[in-house]
Amino acid sequence: MMFRSKKVAGIALAVASVTALAACSSSGSGSGGGNNNNGGSSSVVKVPGGIGSIPMAAAGAKKKAGTITWAMAPGATPNWILPVIPSANNSVYNAFNFIDQSWRPLYWTVNGVVPEVVNNMSLAAQPVYSDGNKTLTIKMNSSYKWSNGKPLTANDLLFTIDFIKAAIKASPANWAGYTPKHFPDNLVSATAPDASTLVLKLNGAVNPTWFTEDILSSVNPMPSADWAKSSASGSVLPAAQWTPANMAGVFKYLTAQAKSVSTYTTNPLWQIVDGPYKLSQYNTTTGAFTMVPNTTYGGPHVTPMSNFQAVAFTSDAAEFNAVKSKSIDVGFIPSANIPQLPQVLRLGYNYFGEPDFGMNFLNYNFKDTTNHFNSIINQTYFRQAMAHVEDQQGWISAFMHGAGAPAYGPIPAYPKSPFLPSNAATNPYPFSVSSAVSLLKAHGWTVNAGGTDVCQSAGSGASQCGAGIPAGTQLKFNLIYNSGSQLITSEMTDLVSKAKQAGINITLQSSNFNYMISNYLDPYAPANENKWAMQDFGGETNSTYPTTFSLFNTGGSNQIGDYSDPKADQLINASITSSDPAAVRSEAQYLTASQPSMFEPNNDYTWAWKTSIGSTMPEAWENLTQYYTTPEYWYLNG
């Protein structure tokens, strides 16, 4: 699970424009990512629910290498290089757009707009589970090796697991994928009987889909034959010496190197990769970077490969100016510029947009004691009242220009999911200020529309404000938002206005994405837990199995506001230990009713690329809508 800004996810197409531009494409279907389908009967790929189209590569098309430029999201530039990512750096921008280019995850889990494991982009065959799903055997993919010629082995995976253990021992915040009592705490043993095989024995049964696609996909093997040392001049430790004490030294050394951003391009550690690219340039001020092909890359890719240059921008407007001036090869289309999509086409770009698999949300802080907010937000009726003042359809129409889909719980209504619960198919708390007012009045609040509501009837009775809320408490608190996103800014401004009509007095405070995920995400930022009541930095990207494990379970590694509910914990635990597909649906149904966050509509994430840029498979463009960047498939037309 990775956090993301919604800054460029606020990309939409006016309904009128959909009709006008539909003539530019013909219908078809995706070929299924990793399959390297280079042609078909249709000249374009048209994905249901998406906007725009993706031209298919012409048979026999000439391909040449050069440098292809790609636009980064303003304010969300990469700032971490080590494949084991701390919570403070846990974003799709560090993981999918930067680190994964050089160090591939064990399992690649996005196939264009289809959430599934892509076998030939994964470093191992899918695990074989046995012993009641308590043992799994992993066979490494022999196609992959390190850029210095050394083989990629099971020992590299074992080394990475031992490194993660050392990181967690120093601080649970050192690995964003960690939740106490779960991986790697639940490992009874990890052994490598031969160079290509790793056997993991767990202390309890797991859901195989979840463990493969949520947990193991978060593990990027690291080169043990070169990185298993505690200093630049130190000897590389053999596997027999990967003791906790020795691994503590390795962790300290590699982490110190990762913090030295000024040496990213000169440190020889970062040149040993198994992914398609090596870092060649990195701007410590802007985060812009350039990567060159790893000529020994064993995964699927175009031949020849081009350099990949990530360009930094200070604002959406600056980025779109680059599109208009044709100075960027692959760029996003900000929501404010959607009416100009016909112009973008005339400039010589293709475009495609689709919602991603994750969720957009406004987070509540269940630990903020300021003005008794922790007690207020702990009341389910109040969270439901907040849902009633969220105008999802209005946001889709006004801010997404019609190209968005509502989401009423952790599993959005679109893209379609077989796990969608019945209570999330339609809005259980439709926009209605009067409904919010009725809920507040029914629970002991004196409503002052346009002003600030006051708790009149203190207590924990059915018609009272709730436990821990004294009489005279005002409904008054702050909301910190990612002001780099015009979409978030518009949504939060509208939310504050609608809430005010119900006497809920919210003060907006602006911030930026990187600062927010580093300073306001509990449980690893406790010093700031009384500095925010609500926050909206964007959202998160789900795996193919949409459990909210680590996000909404008590003590979860990606907990943002410390929501804790024994019933939710029970259902989430069932989702990750049972093979019953109904388990995760039951989890989502409960959370849709409980509203641990304010769930927001999903909007299309739209990208444009020059017609002079091709791809050997359409999924490489679809991947962008899911925050994954796969430039190893892109090429310059010859």
Where are these predicted regions, by residue range?
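N-terminal lobe/hinge region of extracytoplasmic solute-binding protein
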Residues: 68-131, 272
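Periplasmic binding protein-like
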Residues: 70, 149, 323-324, 328-332, ...
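Gly/Pro-rich hinge or "lid" segments in bacterial periplasmic/extracellular proteins
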Residues: 111, 219-300, 438
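Aromatic- and charge-enriched surface segment that lines or borders ligand/interaction sites
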Residues: 125-172, 193, 199-201, 319-322, ...
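Extracellular/periplasmic solute-recognition and catalytic clefts
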Residues: 164-177, 191, 280-296, 309-374, ...
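Surface-exposed binding/hinge segments that line
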Residues: 177-254
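Append "and occasionally in soluble cytosolic enzymes with long acidic Gly/Pro-rich linkers
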Residues: 290-295, 377-496
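Long beta-strand-rich cores associated with HINT superfamily self-processing modules
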Residues: 609-638
